[in-house]
């Protein structure tokens, strides 16, 4: 969004509300999910109108899920660069300001807000799972390309829920070893729809703290 084009370390600019965050996640990544759904339906397979609408709805939320996870993971770095994607109206409800997120000791106070967005990210990610599970059985390459980010997203959300994201000395990141393991699992699972569903779930994951 244009509001972040002129940021500097002396000033932290935040999104105002939930609508602006949703607009941002759509413009950066939800629109990408929409675009690739268009490409998939134009070149890979045909579906009826109901299935088409389901794919577009879930494809948009697929993209939003990955961007929201990135936002949650990168909060300290973004704040240090003068950008706060956590809506100001949400922070004010808990007597917080963007600059307070530079202090890892404020995590307990920030946790209710943070967990609410982890839950939202899980809900979006469940739509990503729905998108993959809607693919025809012969689309194993497409399944593989989607399973990978879903599993990395699930692992990242688990780590975010268990750690202090405001601690810049200990950044939250899925290890290379785990990514290699996820790659192998994704490759094997993508061969069939049944294996895929067993690995990534059936879009009913619920975040509970």
Predicted regions and their residues:
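Active-site flanking residues adjacent to catalytic metal/cofactor-binding acidic residues
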Residues: 73
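Catalytic cores of Mg2+-dependent Asp-rich isoprenoid enzymes
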Residues: 1-65, 76-209
């Amino acid at each position: 969004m244009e509001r972040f084009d002129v940021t500097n370390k002396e000033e932290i600019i935040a999104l105002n509300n939930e609508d602006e965050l949703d607009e941002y996640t759509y413009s950066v990544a939800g629109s990408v999910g929409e675009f690739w759904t268009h490409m998939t339906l134009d070149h890979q397979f045909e579906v009826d109108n109901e299935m088409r609408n389901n794919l577009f709805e879930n494809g948009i939320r697929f993209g939003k899920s990955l961007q929201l996870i990135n936002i949650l993971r990168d909060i300290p770095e973004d704040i240090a660069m003068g950008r706060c994607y956590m809506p100001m109206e949400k922070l004010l409800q808990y007597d917080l300001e963007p600059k307070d997120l530079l202090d890892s000791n404020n995590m307990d106070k920030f946790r209710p807000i943070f967990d609410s967005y982890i839950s939202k990210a899980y809900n979006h990610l469940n739509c990503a799972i729905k998108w993959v599970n809607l693919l025809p059985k012969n689309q194993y390459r497409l399944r593989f390309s989607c399973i990978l980010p879903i599993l990395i997203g699930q692992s990242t959300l688990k780590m975010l829920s268990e750690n202090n994201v405001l601690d810049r000395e200990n950044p939250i990141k899925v290890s290379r070893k785990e990514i290699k393991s996820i790659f192998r699992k994704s490759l094997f699972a993508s061969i069939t729809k049944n294996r895929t569903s067993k690995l990534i779930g059936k879009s009913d994951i619920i975040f509970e703290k």
